[in-house]
Amino acid sequence: MEYRVTDIITLLNAEYKGEVVEKVSKLSPFFHSDEKSLTFAADEKFLKNLSQTKAKVIIVPDIDLPLIEGKGYIVVKDSPRVIMPKLLHFFSRNLKKIEKMREDSAKIGENVDIAPNVYIGHDVVIGNNVKIFPNVTIGEGSIIGDGTVIYSNVSIREFVEIGKNCVIQPGAVIGSDGFGFVKVNGNNTKIDQIGTVIVEDEVEIGANTTIDRGAIGDTIIKKYTKIDNLVQIAHNDIIGENCLIISQVGIAGSTTIGNNVTLAGQVGVAGHLEIGDNTMIGAQSGVPGNVEANKILSGHPLVDHREDMKIRVAMKKLPELLKRVKALEEKK
């Protein structure tokens, strides 16, 4: 689908500068765009790297910016973040009306076992040897790879992609809206989440785990990663290959986790950061910033695991040490 740039300019009450581009096909993240994309630069991180995006049309604030050959600017008077609800709604896809439990346009492979009370939406593609248990919902345009097993009460929303030989345990929700809101006139205003979730081959997703769809771009779970029960993965996260994510981990949005990473139970990971390959984070730790590869860390704040163990041992001695300090002060 293509969108006229002039319609977007009118929608945003904006001006245009630079190379004339008539149409774009999608809204994409700044560093993950192509020549058919529209993207936006909301802050200094992006504004100083305008030449680094492949998008030919960029939404920018009304400030003095150098023109770049081959690129056009849609200049908005409001902050680019303020116009986000309007912009993402413009690019959101309208879903078809639900008509029956298995829509006629759905394509079902060979040797597929579908239990009663399963909804299969318009244009869904289900591969061979898939097993789907009762009370599952598979939304419009989703793709389920060969050999995947989907247990009861799983919700897979529209346009989600599930790879081959995956296992999705009961109650998991894949493709729910990310927690995306901005303040408009002092009110929390929802931003349409127009991305999706891509789950690669051989992934397991635990019971009652939730994986949010991307706001712009996709949330990605790479092959052979195993996710335990009751895990929250937010919008636009990228989880690498062969990761282990244990129960009650929460990962905030737009975080990238490398390959072979282990996050132990109840780890909290902040948003917009990177965790390097082969890293292990101990249980109940907090991750507030980037983590280098090949580290074993724990605690809050996060430190080397051996140092964290020494701190915990020392903390047990604090009551006795305080008594000794008080006694020494009284002798003065």
Curated annotation (Swiss-Prot):
Reactions the enzyme catalyzes: a UDP-3-O-[(3R)-3-hydroxyacyl]-alpha-D-glucosamine + a (3R)-hydroxyacyl-[ACP] = a UDP-2-N,3-O-bis[(3R)-3-hydroxyacyl]-alpha-D-glucosamine + holo-[ACP] + H(+)
Subunit structure: Homotrimer.
Function: Catalyzes the N-acylation of UDP-3-O-acylglucosamine using 3-hydroxyacyl-ACP as the acyl donor. Is involved in the biosynthesis of lipid A, a phosphorylated glycolipid that anchors the lipopolysaccharide to the outer membrane of the cell.
Protein name, as recorded: UDP-3-O-acylglucosamine N-acyltransferase
Domain of life per record: Bacteria
EC number, UniProt record: 2.3.1.191
Annotated organism of origin: Fusobacterium nucleatum subsp. nucleatum (strain ATCC 25586 / DSM 15643 / BCRC 10681 / CIP 101130 / JCM 8532 / KCTC 2640 / LMG 13131 / VPI 4355)
GO molecular function, one term: N-acyltransferase activity
Assigned protein family: Belongs to the transferase hexapeptide repeat family. LpxD subfamily.
Keyword flag DNA damage: no
Keyword field: Acyltransferase, Lipid A biosynthesis, Lipid biosynthesis, Lipid metabolism, Repeat, Transferase
Record flagged with keyword Repeat: yes
Biological process according to GO: lipid A biosynthetic process
InterPro entries: Hexapep, Hexapep_transf_CS, LpxD, Trimer_LpxA-like_sf, UDP_GlcNAc_AcTrfase_non-rep
Lineage: Bacteria, Fusobacteriati, Fusobacteriota, Fusobacteriia, Fusobacteriales
Pathway: Bacterial outer membrane biogenesis; LPS lipid A biosynthesis
PROSITE patterns: HEXAPEP_TRANSFERASES
Pfam families: Hexapep, Hexapep_2, LpxD
Active-site residues per Swiss-Prot or TrEMBL entry: 235 (proton acceptor)
GO CC annotation, single: membrane
